[in-house]
Swiss-Prot record:
ATP binds at residue 274. This is Cysteine--tRNA ligase. InterPro entries: Cys-tRNA-ligase, Cys-tRNA-synt_Ia_DALR, Cys-tRNA/MSH_ligase, Rossmann-like_a/b/a_fold, tRNA-synt_1_cat_dom, tRNAsynth_Ia_anticodon-bd. It is found in: Cytoplasm. Monomer. The lineage of its organism: Bacteria, Thermotogati, Thermotogota, Thermotogae, Petrotogales.
């Protein structure tokens, strides 16, 4: 039986640094709240992607099987508003910005997560989920046609945000409605207004509320109880509090065992957000800076603290990142293009132990980033003195251990290797689907297409053949 190192993380629910004990030994399942796809990603959206891409890589490095889900919210008030501005169907807005998301992820050189479900692919499951909450007495239909979750019926409400219900009623910003029994009650289903998209339901025409989608998609893909729910700390209340309430009310189980939240990115001390209009789009940033500059900038600060960002701060980071890149390039030149793999010595083992010890301590990436810079300085000294053993050791550690785990300073070959498994799997799936269509087994062919769509993979049959994205 494999022995795993003890990993400590800060759990928002308990308010303490705790040992991460998986629900199932050897496996860790994570749900990360994703973007509402009505605009381009900004640097604030990129922070959790960078953090949890690295966290996933670390868990895999020490031997865990990791399933990481990030959703797309593709039906929402903001999307409807954007569709009106552009005079487009709301579906087209969502599709466009999901495509732009993947372009930005490619430019960021971030690995795709295991599943990227879309809300609109889970409306039937959402309706069933709400019906069950209604049957159990946690939901009610209001006079305006909306269906609300009744907070007073759930005695554990406020546990995640560490607030009491009576305190929450005063001074907390929630969606106001005269039709609610309690100001804290939140919409599970919103009745459609004229000109808005809708789905048929037992409560009339409408669409899902914001909070219900994540509870449904996470439970459908990861099960009623999974290991970690993650996201920005601005989501703790009300979004994650509401997610947790409706999930536990429905299943009677604990939903996410642990909750991890990253701090915000600020411009001039203000939280960055599209709605505030003070955003720095990731695409524009990556035209000015290499993706490693942004990744190192974010990973050099602890994931839970807020980060102030400016072009000057990123320029300063760029200088140190370029020094590392130059030392790695010089090492490759020293060995005529390919640095030989070193023998596993005590030094090699010590560096690996430092990596694991640091990242097991509430994901202390700043210590690992600092060690990369230290190793790079030693690499430069070794290049000057032509110390071949140190050159090989430090190059390998930066490229293949520290860099590979954090997702920085990777070669093109390493980046391509990260994507090859999905491409190979999709080739097999499409070949199977083509064989089914040749046998006129269209129901099975459509089943594959529809279920791939649920996890964010779109299949299109064209005259030139079947394509996926």
């Amino acid at each position: 039986m494999k022995r795993f190192p003890t990993i400590k993380i800060y759990d928002t629910l308990s308010g303490q640094v705790v040992d991460l004990v998986p629900v199932k030994e050897g496996e860790i399942k994570i749900y990360l709240c994703g973007p509402t796809v009505y605009n381009l990603l900004h640097i604030g959206n990129a922070r959790p992607i960078i953090i949890f891409d690295a966290f996933r890589r670390f868990l895999e490095y020490i031997g865990y099987k990791v399933t990481l889900v990030q959703n797309f919210t593709d039906i929402d008030d903001k999307i409807i508003e954007q569709a009106k501005k552009e005079n487009l169907p709301f579906e087209e807005v969502g599709k466009r910005y999901i495509i732009e998301y993947w372009r930005d992820m490619t430019a960021l050189k971030a690995r795709a997560f295991n599943f990227h479900p879309k809300t609109t692919n889970y409306v039937d499951e959402i309706i069933s989920y709400i019906k069950e909450l209604e049957e159990k007495g946690y939901a009610y239909k209001a006079e305006n046609g909306d269906v609300y979750f009744e907070v007073e019926k759930f005695s554990r409400y406020g546990e995640l945000s560490h607030r009491k219900v009576e305190d929450l009623k005063v001074g907390v910003r929630v969606e106001v409605s005269e039709y609610k029994k309690n100001p804290l009650d939140f919409a599970l289903w919103k009745a459609s207004k004229e000109g808005e998209p809708f789905w048929e339901s037992p409560w009339g025409k409408g669409r899902p509320g914001w909070h219900i989608e994540c509870s449904v998609m996470s439970s459908e893909i990861l099960g009623d109880t999974f290991d970690i729910h993650a996201g920005g700390n601005d989501l703790i209340f009300p979004h994650h509090e509401n997610e947790r309430a409706q999930a536990i009310a429905k299943s009677g189980k604990d939903f996410a065992k642990y909750w991890m939240h990253n701090g915000m990115i600020r411009m001039a001390q203000d939280k960055m957000s599209k709605s505030l209009g003070n955003v720095w789009y990731l695409r524009d940033l990556l035209k000015k800076f290499d993706s490693d500059v942004l990744k190192i900038f974010i990973l050099s600060k602890h994931y839970r603290i807020p980060i102030d960002v400016s072009e000057e701060l990123l320029r300063n980071q760029e200088v140190s990142v370029n020094r590392v890149k130059e030392s790695l390039n010089e090492a490759e030149t020293f060995f005529n293009g390919k640095v030989p793999c070193p023998q596993k010595m005590n030094y090699f083992k010590e560096q690996e132990e430092y990596l694991i010890s640091s990242l097991s301590n509430d994901f202390d990436t700043p210590s690992v980033v600092a060690r990369i810079f230290e190793l790079s300085r030693d690499l430069n000294k070794a290049l000057n003195s032509r110390d071949e053993e140190t050159i090989k050791n430090n190059y390998y550690i930066i490229r293949n251990i520290y860099g590979s785990v954090l997702g920085v300073f990777e070669t093109n070959e390493q980046i391509q290797k990260n994507n090859v498994e999905l491409n190979q799997l999709m080739e097999i799936i499409l070949n199977v689907r083509s064989a089914l269509r040749e046998e006129k087994l269209y129901n099975l062919s459509d089943y594959i297409r529809d279920n791939l769509s649920k996890i964010g993979i779109e299949i299109k049959d064209t005259p030139e053949g079947t394509k996926w994205s």
